[in-house]
Amino acid sequence: MLPTENRLRRREDFATAVRRGRRVGRSTLVVHLRSGATDPHAPGESAPRTRAGFVVSKAVGVAVVRNKVKRRLRHLMRDRIDLLPPGSLVVVRALPGAGDADHAQLARDLDAALARLLGGGAR
């Protein structure tokens, strides 16, 4: 599970990542990344933590399917959060196909999107 201190929870933070960050889409998800954003909510920290949030709409499926997708995405981000620059804000938005995708497909799409956002991947 993704640690609590690495979770994106505030509406303003989601809006910042989506509106001011870069975006890469894949078949099952879209990833928004705002690199090196400072956290105004933690003024005492010297190195701001990278935080991730997830958006899974009703278009993905019923509640059980949406929650399954969210759990899978949180688990996948836990292993990848250290690859991102400190202070980054990441929003992973699941597309309707994510409900039918298996864990491996979500992992491939997330890896491809992050690689592209970090400048190491081709289209």
Curated annotation (Swiss-Prot):
EC class (word): hydrolase
Recorded GO MF terms: 3'-tRNA processing endoribonuclease activity; ribonuclease P activity; tRNA binding
Recorded superkingdom: Bacteria
A biological process term (GO) from this entry: tRNA 3'-end processing
Keyword field: Endonuclease, Hydrolase, Nuclease, RNA-binding, tRNA processing
Transit peptide found in the keyword field: no
UniProt KW RNA-binding keyword: yes
Entry EC number(s): 3.1.26.5
Family annotation (PROSITE patterns): RIBONUCLEASE_P (PS00648)
GO cellular component: ribonuclease P complex
Pfam family, one: Ribonuclease_P
InterPro entries assigned: Ribosomal_Su5_D2-typ_SF, Ribsml_uS5_D2-typ_fold_subgr, RNase_P, RNase_P_CS
Classification via Gene3D superfamilies: 3.30.230.10
Substrates-to-products reaction catalysed: Endonucleolytic cleavage of RNA, removing 5'-extranucleotides from tRNA precursor
UniProt-listed NCBIfam families: rnpA
Subunit structure: Consists of a catalytic RNA component (M1 or rnpB) and a protein subunit.
Similarity comment text for this entry: Belongs to the RnpA family.
Listed HAMAP family: RNase_P
Protein name: Ribonuclease P protein component
Organism encoding this protein: Streptomyces coelicolor (strain ATCC BAA-471 / A3(2) / M145)
Gene: rnpA
